[in-house]
Structures are given as C-alpha cells and as structure tokens.
C-alpha cells in the first residue's frame, strides 16, 4: 500500500513537473501576508510572487500605437465646449446684474422684463463668443505645436497660451501683442505649475532627504 502511494506521488510529481507546476512553491506562511484585494485569486502554482500581481490602478488594453492619455485634438472639443458654456453662464449672470442695475428705477412690467432679458442674452453671447474664440485659438496652437514637436508636455501648454494671447490682441499694435502674450504666458504658467505641484513637492522632499 505504501509502495502504491509512493508510485502515485511520483507520477503526480512527474506530471506536475511536466506541466511546469512542480517548481518552487510558496508556503502558507508566505501567502498569509498577501492582501486579498479585488477578485485576484491566489494560487500556489504561480512562478511569481502574488504580491507583485496586485494592481493599484485600472489597466486597459490599448490598440497598437495608441496613447495612454488623450491628445490635444481629443481635448480640443471638450475645451472649446466647456469654455463656451462657462462664458454663456458667466455672461448671463453679468447681464442679469447689469439689467437689474439699469432698470432699478422702472416698475416691474413687461418692458423691464424684456430689457433685462435682452441684456442677459447679449452678455451671454458676448462672453461665450469671447471664451470660445480663445479656446479655439489655444486648441489650434496646441495641436499644431504637438504635431510639430511630436511630444505632449507643459511646454506645449505655455507656448500655445502665449501665442493665443498674442494673436488675440494683435489688433492693438505691438503693445497689445506684448500684453496679450504676457497674459497668456502668465495664465498657462500658473496652470502648468498647478498641475505639477504634487510632483514638484515630491521631488523637493526626496532631495531634502
């Protein structure tokens, strides 16, 4: 009986070795500290430490040549639409404020309501057109710079913002171009600094240690 059991164990071990499952395994003590996150099963037949298989973030299968993040062209539609809606909302509120201020001496009547409504629509369209035009120029410059350089980084953001300000204020002469470029440079630099603030803090902490 013992011989039969021994031969059975040998045959099982031989089959396990043939299929690659007879390598170095992990004991219960090794697997006790592995966190059970998600639906990841733990198997003693793995040839790697299961602790390295825990995924902190979602992983997606991307087509060949695809980027992990959206480029300037994909973000252009969201940027332009968001700026138009933001401008329309801000302009409507500003128009309501101006309409109430200009008609405060008038009693509540249909002419006053029409005047307030006209002010709301006029200011909403004005601000939506302004911010939408800026977003369109910024997105166009961003796409051109990205395609020209073949890279997507904060330099594209700052350069696109500076060129947008210069072109938007080009009708004001050299002084207007300088002011527009400086305004675009300042705003985009602050935006880039805000996006990289956590990374900069981590780098400074590592250098201090």
Curated annotation (Swiss-Prot):
Keywords, sorted A to Z: Membrane, Mitochondrion, Mitochondrion inner membrane, Protein transport, Translocation, Transmembrane, Transmembrane helix, Transport
Keyword match Transmembrane helix: yes
Subcellular location: Mitochondrion inner membrane
One of the record's GO molecular function terms: protein transmembrane transporter activity
Annotated TM spans: 73-93, 125-145, 181-197
Pfam families attached to this UniProt entry: Tim17
Major place of residence: mitochondrion
Signal peptide span: none
GO BP: intracellular protein transport; positive regulation of protein processing; protein import into mitochondrial matrix; response to 3,3',5-triiodo-L-thyronine; type 2 mitophagy
Membrane topology: Multi-pass membrane protein
A cellular component annotation (GO) from this entry: mitochondrial intermembrane space
Family: Belongs to the Tim17/Tim22/Tim23 family.
Subunit description: Component of the TIM23 complex at least composed of TIMM23, TIMM17 (TIMM17A or TIMM17B) and TIMM50; within this complex, directly interacts with TIMM50. The complex interacts with the TIMM44 component of the PAM complex and with DNAJC15. Upon mitochondrial depolarization, interacts with PINK1; the interaction is required for PINK1 accumulation at the outer mitochondrial membrane, kinase activation by autophosphorylation and PRKN recruitement to mitochondria.
Job of this protein: Essential component of the TIM23 complex, a complex that mediates the translocation of transit peptide-containing proteins across the mitochondrial inner membrane. Has a role in the activation of stress-induced mitophagy by protecting PINK1 from OMA1-mediated degradation and facilitating its accumulation at the outer mitochondrial membrane in response to depolarization.
Protein name in UniProt: Mitochondrial import inner membrane translocase subunit Tim23
